[in-house]
Amino acid sequence: PVTTLRYDLPEQTHVNITVYDMLGRQVKTLINHTQDAGYRSVIWNAINDYGKPVSAGIYLYQIQAGEYISTKKMVLLK
């Protein structure tokens, strides 16, 4: 299973997108670098930071871009 996260950057900034489980444990860092302004997307293939597949369930993802921070839920189905 894969999922695509889409976001829009109004200006060039450092972006960090991290996936967490429902207990707040970090599962996967998807992006952690500076990106140019524009419409962006990143694909998560349900693999954690250690290269292991994760279980189906509810996950949180947090997008940090400059001063902007947003945390949202997603459901991973297998």
Where are the model-predicted features located?
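Surface-exposed, proline-anchored Ser/Thr-rich loop/turn motifs
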Residues: 1-12, 19-25, 56, 75-78
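Extracellular and select intracellular beta-sandwich modules with Ser/Thr-enriched
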Residues: 68-72
